[in-house]
Swiss-Prot record:
Pfam families: MIP. SUPFAM superfamilies: Aquaporin-like. The gene is glpF5. GO terms for cellular component: plasma membrane. This is Glycerol uptake facilitator protein-like 5.
Length: 250
């Protein structure tokens, strides 16, 4: 990583903003009424592939833009996981997390503004919430926790392999593409139960926007579930990075 810590904080802010804008923006295009991606809420022309592509590109493009500056965490679980393992300084964990959450909030505010007419036309309040935050479709916090934990563990393990592998370590742009594809694959394969979040900032920041702003046709923000996509990804990240260290070293 290069540049001052202030530049790294800015990179985390704008990177997370872009992640949420492209990822949650794809969800909005897929599930809000009368968008170009969907004529009926919940019946997207692009389907889940549209959403997966949004999140995959939402991680890949900021990685290409800001990876050399901040490491392109964009995710409190990654930051905390790296700190636990000793490859990121604890002194800068809190600032990274703050700017990641602020970036997620800013990205969601842009989505709300840009899709405002479509929020007004969408009467399904669960579809509306889905463009902000996640929930467990089986109404099970345990199922949600396990899904988010396992998904994030696989994500971090895979990302470590891509960025630290012998070939990809010398071809960082290809590694960035690989991480984008990994995110898209995770959304396709593990998106059924919860969404998924895999990222505390991507869920909690937009959930705050849903709760605090006068979103048309909104229902509950489901705060009883909100701890799951915050705690589970952090636990999963620590597990994933420890497994990688045990078998392959750092």
């Amino acid at each position: 990583m290069t540049g001052s810590w202030e530049a790294r904080y800015a990179a985390e802010f704008f990177g997370t903003l872009i992640l949420v804008l492209l990822g949650n923006g794809a969800v909005a295009n897929a599930f809000l009424k009368n968008t170009t991606g969907n004529d009926d809420p919940g019946l997207a022309n692009g389907g889940w592939l549209l959403v997966a592509s949004g999140y995959g590109l939402g991680v890949m493009l900021p990685a290409m833009m800001f990876g050399s500056i901040s490491g392109n965490h964009l995710n409190p679980a990654i930051t905390i996981g790296q700190a636990v393992i000793g490859i990121f300084p604890w002194a800068h964990v809190a600032p990274y997390l703050i700017w990641q959450f602020l970036g997620a909030i800013a990205g969601q505010c842009l989505i709300l503004a840009l899709y405002w007419p479509h929020y007004r036309q969408t009467t399904d309040n669960e579809a509306v919430l889905g463009t902000f935050a996640t929930s467990d479709h089986a109404n099970s916090q345990l199922n949600g926790f396990v899904t988010e934990m396992v998904g994030t563990a696989v994500l971090i393990f895979g990302a470590m392999g891509l960025y630290r592998g012998m070939f990809f370590h010398q071809n960082i742009d290809i590694a960035n593409i690989g991480v984008g594809l990994l995110i898209a694959a995770m959304v396709i394969s593990l998106g059924g139960p919860t969404g998924p979040a895999l990222n505390p900032a991507r869920d909690l920041g937009p959930r705050l926007v849903h709760a605090l702003f006068p979103v048309p046709n909104k229902g509950s923000s489901h705060w009883e579930y909100s701890w799951v996509p915050v705690v589970a990804p952090i636990v999963g990240a620590v597990i994933g990075i420890w497994i990688y260290k045990i078998f392959f070293g750092l």
